[in-house]
Amino acid sequence: MNITASKEDYLKAILHLKEKNGYVRATDVAEVLSVKKPSVSIAFGKLAADDLITVHENHQVDLTKAGYDIAAKINHSYETVKQFLCSIGVPEKVAEHDACRVEHYLSQESVVSIGGLVGELSLIHISEPTRH
């Protein structure tokens, strides 16, 4: 199975929508990803063929266990990179954009190391004396 960055984006969007709304529809995914509904239908077909989502008769979608695992991993990478970038002074909107671009290409080892660095940076910021 070939998991492309595009498929990962769809899985992550489905995860977020499910957590936010309790359900996922193609129109919601299209809106989140700024794509047309026919593109979502094609992507859903590919994700279902890869057994990453289940499309129900009412057209709502759920992640399978495999789909959830991939979405959670990508989301963790995104959040870790975003936190790191924000902690070194990158504006939040820029950090969100950049994290979304690199989340697909980092190894788990890199994500763990970046997460450790984020933790160390937060400790440094906490322990810094207030300057007057």
Task: Locate each region found by the language model.
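Conserved small/polar residues in nucleotide/adenosyl-binding loops
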Residues: I124-H132
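Append "Primarily bacterial transcriptional regulators
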Residues: V29-A30, L47, A95
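N-terminal helix-turn-helix DNA-binding core of bacterial DNA-binding proteins
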Residues: N2-V35
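Basic amphipathic alpha-helical segments that dock to polyanions
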Residues: V40-A48
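Glycine-centered, phosphate/nucleic-acid-interacting loop/turn motifs that mediate DNA/RNA or nucleotide
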Residues: D51
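Amphipathic alpha-helical dimerization/coiled-coil segments
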Residues: E79-G119
